[in-house]
Amino acid sequence: MAPKMVISLGSSRRRKRGEMLFRFEAFCQPGYPANFAGAGGFRDNVRTLLGFAHLEAGVHGETKCWSFQLELHRHPPTVVRLFVVEEEVAASPHRQCHLCRHIGWGRHLICSKRYHFLLPRRESAAEADGLCFAINHGGGGGAEKASSKGTTTTASSRGHLLHGVVHLNGYGHLVALHGLEGGSDFVSGHQIMDLWDRICSALHVRTVSLVDTARKGHMELRLLHGVAYGETWFGRWGYRYGRPSYGVALPSYRQSLHVLGSMPLCVLVPHLSCFSQELPMVVTKYQAISGHKLLSLGDLLRFMLELRARLPATSVTAMDYRGIMSEASCRWSAKRVDMAARAVVDALRRAEPAARWVTRQEVRDAARAYIGDTGLLDFVLKSLGNHIVGNYVVRRTMNPVTKVLEYCLEDVSSVLPAVAAGGGVPAQGKMRVRFQLTRAQLMRDLVHLYRHVLKEPSQALTGGAFGAIPVAVRMVLDIKHFVKDYHEGQAAASSNGGGGFGHPHINLCCTLLVSNGSPELAPPYETVTLPAHATVGELKWEAQRVFSEMYLGLRSFAADSVVGVGADQEGLPVLGLVDVGSAVVVQGSVGEQINGEDHERKEEAAAAAVCEGSGGGERVVDCACGAVDDDGERMACCDICEAWQHTRCAGIADTEDAPHVFLCSRCDNDVVSFPSFNC
């Protein structure tokens, strides 16, 4: 269970007095509440933002908490509160971030601070019980010897609409997000995601990762949206494939999405019709509603998702057949057209088995026993298609194999229950009368497609050319880690924004070369801002200050020199020796922090972790799927070779407990082949 931090807050009346009120939809847009400088990066911008926040009176000790009042609506007044908690990592019992290790950032140095951005579900609950959130984001799963079944989300994050954490160096994680379907009273998931994206952009966050386990009902959104749009739901905000899971690399992931999304409906529907009449009818229904040709499974799912978003209470699916009488080519009376339409329906009702698709010629031959006028019959057959006749909807489609029109009946109650209850189609008017498709009905159709085509495909979709479907679905579902690089468009601005002759400050990209430290002590480049007249010596000491304040492992770092600049040049101005915006390497050493005689402290310091994924003994991951490091999925450790591998790859189902004694396949074979000794 992840350790939690609880922040006690003051009373609502005391906290709200004199606070600023910010517009939710505009918060952290350019210039609101401030213009954030790109040069200093996240570490400087977050301090600027917190200067506009309210410092919570109930917080004591080293942990600090600020809050912002965000106004959703003015009439009626609706306000939510965003909290920002500054966590001192040195004082934390869990310094390492498991999410960094799972996304592949295990080599990142541990920062001195982490900032948690929290949007509680209900402010009143946070005031009464305190602000509770996880400080160790293991979330279950991963390289642990535990025997728990499957993986779980962090329980303390479920109580928040938003929980994001950003390390002081600008790398962060979106831990939790819940919209209206996840318990929010006022704010949708899109609005919360927009807010988080604006905060990250404004504060010049570098890269943000997330684990996508979002669902809509029983449907995995990363699969549903992946097939429909070629990307996850978070893709509209720029989140892309982050790292392999179960050995699924980026090319395989992209190919799986392409295979599923481009599956032709003209090939898929005939195979489905052999096992289920409902699926072809669903496809035909939305093909008729769309008004344009839906060629692939991706086209169909994308249309259904977009239709759901804009579906009014009285959307359309079918039309009263009497509307065909207004067509210019109709030269028959209403009574004769009505008789012909009912004859067609009777012919379809007598089809065996029920609800099967019947060719146009079969319907025509059966109806001719009652309608002698072949011209009238041909007109009705040509015009009927997704029209309501009595208590039935006449569906029509073209068989992609035979190229012949086929007809089928669907009970009108599946389109509009009120029509069936009221005894058929209303009698008023002879123009086209449209009937509604509710969102609940569309969702039922969507779940039906998802279940029988993607999640639990029938036998028709597990062999031959369709055998790739289950494999592609598994690969798409295996990828859960996604990242967004906010630093792409900011690097150029940071290097060129300010600096050079005529500017009061210069910005330099600096990193460190630690001469006596571990190879792990290799921090990323940071922007160091100096006065335009600063000397090389001042550059050296400023770089020392920035890096020692940012990383725990560099607190004792002492700068010796600037690589490429002689020791006799330290008193010279930086401008002229170093180009503005260029990369600068400062060389130095990490001071001794332990007493050589204190053996106990020495062992403790040697075991202390300086990186997010180090310390406590390096784990060796060697899985049959090709994984070589911890990807956050449930793993087990071999009791002989001590190599970790996925429990799923070892044949242990997610619903099963891991065995107390576990042997990998290689060690198991070695034990079996070991010669026996007879005493």
Curated annotation (Swiss-Prot):
InterPro entries: YbeY_CS, Zinc_finger_PHD-type_CS, Znf_FYVE_PHD, Znf_PHD, Znf_PHD-finger, Znf_RING/FYVE/PHD. Gene3D superfamilies: Zinc/RING finger domain, C3HC4 (zinc finger). One of its GO terms (biological process) is microgametogenesis. The keyword Iron-sulfur does not apply. A zinc finger (PHD-type) spans 620-670. GO terms for cellular component: nucleus. Signal peptide: none annotated. Keywords: Developmental protein, Metal-binding, Transcription, Transcription regulation, Zinc, Zinc-finger. Disruption phenotype: Male sterility due to lack of tapetal programmed cell death (PCD), delayed tapetal degeneration, abnormal pollen wall formation and aborted microspore development. GO terms for molecular function: zinc ion binding. SUPFAM superfamilies: FYVE/PHD zinc finger (SSF57903). Pfam families: PHD. Probable transcriptional activator required for tapetal programmed cell death (PCD) and degeneration, and pollen development in anthers. PANTHER family: PHD FINGER PROTEIN MALE MEIOCYTE DEATH 1-RELATED (PTHR46201), PHD FINGER PROTEIN MALE STERILITY 1 (PTHR46201:SF1). This is PHD finger protein PERSISTENT TAPETAL CELL 1. It comes from Oryza sativa subsp. japonica. The gene is PTC1.
